[in-house]
Amino acid sequence: MRIGLLGGSFNPAHAGHLMLARRALRALRLDQVWLMVSPGNPLKPSKGMAPFRVRLASAERIADGRRIVATDIESRLGQRFTVKTVGLLKQRFPHVRFVWLMGADGLAQLSHWKRWRRLAAMVPIAVLPRPGSVSPALRGAAASVLRHQRRPSRESPVLAERKGNAWTFLSAPQNDISATALRESGQFRPDSDQE
Protein backbone atom coordinates (compact mmCIF):
# COMPACT_ATOMS: atom_id res chain seq x y z
CA MET A 1 0.00 0.00 0.00
CA ARG A 2 1.21 3.52 -0.88
CA ILE A 3 0.04 6.37 1.34
CA GLY A 4 0.69 10.08 1.06
CA LEU A 5 0.85 11.98 4.33
CA LEU A 6 -0.39 15.56 4.08
CA GLY A 7 0.18 17.09 7.48
CA GLY A 8 -0.99 20.49 8.55
CA SER A 9 -2.98 22.67 10.89
CA PHE A 10 -6.02 22.62 8.58
CA ASN A 11 -7.24 25.86 10.12
CA PRO A 12 -9.50 25.22 8.16
CA ALA A 13 -9.12 22.50 5.53
CA HIS A 14 -10.20 23.82 2.14
CA ALA A 15 -10.47 23.12 -1.60
CA GLY A 16 -6.75 23.82 -2.08
CA HIS A 17 -5.87 20.94 0.27
CA LEU A 18 -8.28 18.68 -1.59
CA MET A 19 -6.78 19.67 -4.96
CA LEU A 20 -3.26 18.87 -3.69
CA ALA A 21 -4.40 15.51 -2.29
CA ARG A 22 -6.05 14.53 -5.58
CA ARG A 23 -3.00 15.59 -7.59
CA ALA A 24 -0.74 13.52 -5.33
CA LEU A 25 -3.01 10.46 -5.63
CA ARG A 26 -2.69 10.57 -9.42
CA ALA A 27 0.92 11.67 -9.90
CA LEU A 28 2.41 9.40 -7.23
CA ARG A 29 0.02 6.50 -7.85
CA LEU A 30 -1.00 6.44 -4.21
CA ASP A 31 -3.69 4.25 -2.71
CA GLN A 32 -4.62 6.89 -0.12
CA VAL A 33 -3.78 10.34 1.16
CA TRP A 34 -4.09 10.91 4.88
CA LEU A 35 -4.92 14.45 5.95
CA MET A 36 -2.98 14.43 9.23
CA VAL A 37 -4.38 17.21 11.38
CA SER A 38 -1.68 18.51 13.71
CA PRO A 39 -2.61 18.79 17.38
CA GLY A 40 -0.38 21.86 17.54
CA ASN A 41 2.19 23.06 15.03
CA PRO A 42 5.22 24.25 17.02
CA LEU A 43 6.04 26.78 14.27
CA LYS A 44 2.62 28.45 14.23
CA PRO A 45 1.15 30.78 16.83
CA SER A 46 -1.73 29.40 18.88
CA LYS A 47 -3.59 32.72 18.61
CA GLY A 48 -6.31 32.30 16.00
CA MET A 49 -5.89 28.53 15.95
CA ALA A 50 -9.21 26.71 16.09
CA PRO A 51 -9.61 23.88 18.59
CA PHE A 52 -8.28 20.56 17.36
CA ARG A 53 -11.73 18.94 17.02
CA VAL A 54 -12.95 21.86 14.84
CA ARG A 55 -9.93 21.58 12.54
CA LEU A 56 -10.33 17.80 12.33
CA ALA A 57 -14.01 18.25 11.43
CA SER A 58 -13.05 20.65 8.63
CA ALA A 59 -10.64 18.03 7.23
CA GLU A 60 -13.32 15.33 7.50
CA ARG A 61 -15.68 17.50 5.44
CA ILE A 62 -13.33 17.62 2.46
CA ALA A 63 -12.19 13.98 2.70
CA ASP A 64 -14.08 11.17 0.99
CA GLY A 65 -13.19 8.68 3.75
CA ARG A 66 -11.92 6.17 1.24
CA ARG A 67 -8.96 7.48 -0.78
CA ILE A 68 -8.64 10.79 1.05
CA VAL A 69 -8.90 10.22 4.80
CA ALA A 70 -8.83 12.80 7.59
CA THR A 71 -7.02 11.46 10.62
CA ASP A 72 -6.15 12.41 14.18
CA ILE A 73 -3.32 9.87 14.27
CA GLU A 74 -0.68 12.44 15.22
CA SER A 75 -2.74 13.40 18.26
CA ARG A 76 -3.36 9.75 19.16
CA LEU A 77 0.38 9.09 18.92
CA GLY A 78 0.99 12.03 21.25
CA GLN A 79 3.26 13.76 18.75
CA ARG A 80 3.71 17.30 17.43
CA PHE A 81 6.89 16.80 15.43
CA THR A 82 6.67 15.30 11.95
CA VAL A 83 9.92 13.36 12.21
CA LYS A 84 8.65 11.49 15.28
CA THR A 85 5.21 10.88 13.76
CA VAL A 86 6.65 9.47 10.54
CA GLY A 87 9.05 7.25 12.50
CA LEU A 88 6.20 5.81 14.55
CA LEU A 89 4.02 5.29 11.46
CA LYS A 90 6.81 3.41 9.71
CA GLN A 91 7.17 1.17 12.79
CA ARG A 92 3.43 0.51 13.07
CA PHE A 93 2.90 -0.02 9.35
CA PRO A 94 6.15 -1.62 8.08
CA HIS A 95 4.64 -2.73 4.76
CA VAL A 96 3.23 0.68 3.83
CA ARG A 97 5.20 2.95 1.52
CA PHE A 98 4.75 6.47 2.83
CA VAL A 99 5.39 9.73 0.96
CA TRP A 100 5.42 13.04 2.82
CA LEU A 101 3.36 15.62 0.92
CA MET A 102 3.87 19.32 1.38
CA GLY A 103 3.16 22.60 -0.32
CA ALA A 104 6.03 24.71 -1.59
CA ASP A 105 5.50 27.00 1.41
CA GLY A 106 6.33 24.01 3.63
CA LEU A 107 9.54 23.31 1.70
CA ALA A 108 10.52 26.96 2.17
CA GLN A 109 10.17 26.47 5.96
CA LEU A 110 11.47 22.90 6.16
CA SER A 111 14.91 23.92 7.43
CA HIS A 112 13.20 25.21 10.60
CA TRP A 113 11.57 21.85 11.36
CA LYS A 114 12.91 19.59 14.10
CA ARG A 115 15.38 17.06 12.62
CA TRP A 116 14.30 17.87 9.08
CA ARG A 117 17.32 16.19 7.50
CA ARG A 118 16.40 12.98 9.34
CA LEU A 119 12.83 13.29 8.01
CA ALA A 120 14.15 13.63 4.45
CA ALA A 121 16.26 10.50 4.97
CA MET A 122 13.29 8.53 6.34
CA VAL A 123 10.63 9.18 3.74
CA PRO A 124 10.43 10.47 0.16
CA ILE A 125 8.92 13.93 -0.16
CA ALA A 126 6.63 15.32 -2.86
CA VAL A 127 6.31 19.10 -3.02
CA LEU A 128 3.30 20.74 -4.65
CA PRO A 129 3.05 24.37 -5.76
CA ARG A 130 1.46 27.12 -3.68
CA PRO A 131 0.95 30.62 -5.06
CA GLY A 132 3.93 32.85 -4.34
CA SER A 133 5.92 30.05 -2.70
CA VAL A 134 7.47 28.09 -5.56
CA SER A 135 10.49 30.28 -6.26
CA PRO A 136 11.38 30.97 -2.59
CA ALA A 137 11.02 27.25 -1.81
CA LEU A 138 13.29 26.10 -4.63
CA ARG A 139 15.90 28.71 -3.63
CA GLY A 140 15.59 27.97 0.10
CA ALA A 141 17.93 26.27 2.53
CA ALA A 142 16.26 22.84 2.47
CA ALA A 143 16.12 22.64 -1.33
CA SER A 144 19.78 23.65 -1.46
CA VAL A 145 20.89 21.02 1.07
CA LEU A 146 18.73 18.34 -0.60
CA ARG A 147 19.53 19.35 -4.21
CA HIS A 148 21.32 16.06 -5.00
CA GLN A 149 18.30 14.08 -3.80
CA ARG A 150 15.83 15.84 -6.10
CA ARG A 151 14.24 13.49 -8.62
CA PRO A 152 12.66 14.65 -11.89
CA SER A 153 8.87 14.76 -11.84
CA ARG A 154 8.75 12.01 -14.47
CA GLU A 155 9.93 9.66 -11.69
CA SER A 156 7.04 10.61 -9.40
CA PRO A 157 5.06 7.40 -10.09
CA VAL A 158 7.85 5.40 -8.40
CA LEU A 159 8.76 7.89 -5.65
CA ALA A 160 6.88 5.82 -3.04
CA GLU A 161 9.22 2.88 -3.73
CA ARG A 162 12.15 4.84 -2.32
CA LYS A 163 12.91 4.66 1.39
CA GLY A 164 13.91 8.32 1.63
CA ASN A 165 16.66 10.61 0.39
CA ALA A 166 14.49 11.56 -2.57
CA TRP A 167 12.12 14.40 -3.29
CA THR A 168 10.35 15.80 -6.29
CA PHE A 169 8.42 18.87 -7.26
CA LEU A 170 5.05 18.08 -8.83
CA SER A 171 3.50 20.56 -11.20
CA ALA A 172 -0.15 21.30 -10.52
CA PRO A 173 -2.64 24.09 -11.06
CA GLN A 174 -2.28 26.64 -8.29
CA ASN A 175 -5.28 27.56 -6.20
CA ASP A 176 -4.87 30.81 -4.29
CA ILE A 177 -7.42 29.92 -1.63
CA SER A 178 -5.79 29.93 1.79
CA ALA A 179 -6.84 29.13 5.32
CA THR A 180 -5.74 32.62 6.37
CA ALA A 181 -8.02 34.23 3.77
CA LEU A 182 -10.95 32.04 4.86
CA ARG A 183 -10.45 33.04 8.49
CA GLU A 184 -10.06 36.73 7.65
CA SER A 185 -13.20 36.71 5.50
CA GLY A 186 -15.25 35.23 8.35
CA GLN A 187 -16.04 32.06 6.37
CA PHE A 188 -14.35 30.01 9.09
CA ARG A 189 -14.82 30.83 12.74
CA PRO A 190 -12.23 29.05 14.89
CA ASP A 191 -14.47 29.19 17.95
CA SER A 192 -17.35 27.26 16.37
CA ASP A 193 -18.03 23.83 14.92
CA GLN A 194 -19.33 25.34 11.66
CA GLU A 195 -22.22 22.89 11.71
Curated annotation (Swiss-Prot):
Keyword terms of this UniProt record: ATP-binding, NAD, Nucleotide-binding, Nucleotidyltransferase, Pyridine nucleotide biosynthesis, Transferase
Swiss-Prot/TrEMBL GO biological process terms: NAD biosynthetic process
PANTHER family on file: NICOTINATE-NUCLEOTIDE ADENYLYLTRANSFERASE-RELATED, PHOSPHOPANTETHEINE ADENYLYLTRANSFERASE
Catalytic activity: nicotinate beta-D-ribonucleotide + ATP + H(+) = deamido-NAD(+) + diphosphate
Alphabetical list of InterPro entries matching this protein: Cyt_trans-like (IPR004821), NadD/NMNAT (IPR005248), Rossmann-like_a/b/a_fold (IPR014729)
Protein species of origin: Gluconobacter oxydans (strain 621H)
Gene3D superfamilies membership: HUPs
Disulfide bonds: none
Protein name: Probable nicotinate-nucleotide adenylyltransferase
EC identifiers of the protein: 2.7.7.18
Pathway the protein contributes to: Cofactor biosynthesis; NAD(+) biosynthesis; deamido-NAD(+) from nicotinate D-ribonucleotide: step 1/1
Alphabetical list of NCBIfam families matching this protein: nicotinate (nicotinamide) nucleotide adenylyltransferase (TIGR00482), PRK00071.2-2 (NF000843)
A GO term for molecular function: ATP binding
Function: Catalyzes the reversible adenylation of nicotinate mononucleotide (NaMN) to nicotinic acid adenine dinucleotide (NaAD).
Lineage: Bacteria, Pseudomonadati, Pseudomonadota, Alphaproteobacteria, Acetobacterales
Superkingdom assignment: Bacteria
Family listed: Belongs to the NadD family.
